[in-house]
Design a protein with these regions (language model features):
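P-loop NTPase nucleotide-binding core
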Residues: 4-5, 10-14, 18-123
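Hydrophobic residues at beta-strand termini and immediately following loops
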Residues: 39, 184-186
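Conserved Walker B catalytic segment
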Residues: 5, 94-162, 171
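N-terminal pre-P-loop "Q-motif" helix
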Residues: 1
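Short regulatory helix/loop adjacent to the ATP-binding pocket of P-loop NTPases
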Residues: 163-181
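Short glycine-/polar-rich loops that comprise or flank the Walker A/P-loop
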Residues: 32-36, 152-154, 179-182
Length: 195
């Protein structure tokens, strides 16, 4: 509610993901127009894979599916060879794009512009966020920060299990995300205290 991005740090198996999904469900109940997205980037190995996962997660999911929304998305992302598939059970479309190395920054900008132009309140949880520090591209943090800071209607939850890496990313004055988000540490609940 304070309109700040949040950094959520806890060891694995403490309940970060469950907490994020619970908060998203509460947000959707209290604000039905709000859009909430969750993506786990642990399996991504570079910026290109990150951008493709982000596109698959959010593109086409912000608005209700219509022909005009479909055309708008295809036009906006036409240079990335968009492909559309439909979930066989729900019929909900899923978009994916092919991005060349030269198109990475431009495609990320287009995705964030798409979110900004929606005008809707959007929350995006990026789990295992420390993974971006392992990418071979050294400027990933700066690239993301340069876009994220100009999204007035999009809020991020940066979740991670590596306390050292996450703290370094958000508390070191030399890093792009320095003091950009509110820090929250989760620790195990004492069984004796709550049972």
């Amino acid at each position: 509610s304070n309109e700040r991005n949040v950094v959520l740090i806890s060891p694995r198996r403490i309940g970060k993901t469950g907490l994020i999904h619970h908060v998203f469900e509460q947000l959707k109940k209290s604000e039905p127009e709000t859009k909430c997205f969750y993506m786990d980037i642990n399996a991504t190995r570079n910026v290109n894979q990150f951008i493709q996962l982000l596109a698959k997660t959010v593109v086409g999911q912000v608005d209700t599916f219509s022909q005009s929304a479909f055309r708008k998305i295809l036009t906006l992302f036409s240079s990335y060879r968009p492909t559309v598939s439909f979930d066989e059970f729900t019929g909900i479309p899923t978009f994916s794009i092919t991005i060349s190395q030269e198109q990475q920054e431009e495609s990320l900008k287009h995705i964030f512009d798409y979110l900004k132009q929606s005008g809707k309140r959007i929350y995006i949880a990026i789990d295992e966020f420390q993974q971006i520090s392992e990418y071979p591209e050294n400027s990933t943090e700066a690239l993301l920060r340069s876009h994220i800071q100009f999204l007035p209607n999009v809020y991020f939850i940066f979740a991670g299990s590596s306390q050292h890496m996450m703290s370094e990313m958000f508390l070191s004055a030399q890093r792009p995300f320095y003091q950009s988000s509110q820090m929250v540490n989760l620790s195990p609940i004492d069984v004796h205290e709550y049972c």
